[in-house]
Amino acid sequence: MDTRFWGPSGWRLLHLIATAPPRRQTRAFFELLPYVLPCKYCRSSLADYYAVDAVPSTNFAPWLYRIHNRVNGKLRDQKLLKTPNPPWSTVKAEYEALFKAPCTRNAMIGWDFLYSVVYTTPCKAVPSEPLPDAPPSETLTTPELRNRWNTMEREERIQFIGRWWDLLPQVLPYASWRTAFASGPKRPSLTEGHKAVTEWLFQVEQRVCRALHVAANHTSFGGLCRKLSVFQSKCGSKKTRKTKTCRSSVAKGDIGKVKQTRRKSAFFNST
């Protein structure tokens, strides 16, 4: 999926989770993130960043700030980001204010990111394509290495993704979000494919929005699927080390619509 579509949505949700009082499941939730991102290059890069800056047992907000800075640095190297990183004090103040704002808890955020995760649920018909220069498969003896080089079999990856989905409703930053999300329909098995899981999340979104008394961003499943297909990316199908971020051939006008509601900060705009 195109990182310009899901990146800002994901960062905003993840920073809010990291800013909220930590819950028992928060560390495990973040530890599973490198297996879940809807872009193979993003999963690989995040695995590298975790190797040098592991998920802490508490105090997640400054750690996620450092991880986000590493992602921004990668994008600058690729000439995909021009804005500088704001200081930690600014980011800390912004997200603490956002967390405390009464209007924030009234409408759950992060849906574009969550839909991108379900839409890229591994499918039987599409085997994983190893990253360029991947070591021989027999040397990739741990899940971390197989994830790093995108050689995981479907059956193995969906185990990690399934655990992440199970943890999500437990780590959301507000009790009202957690209750509404958990009261939605039961998630189907990921082996049923991305369409079934996307339809499940659509039903969850409708349930959450009704519970929070706000209008849903998506009013029809067909319309949602058309939107997601626009931002679908081949994720660097050409075997070159120059391709390091998933981008689609989406029209500039569509990307412009996504950017209209974003703030001019590296921590709200970066992908």
Identify what each model region corresponds to.
Residues 1-36, 40-271:
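Mid-to-C-terminal functional-domain signal that highlights helix-capping/loop sites
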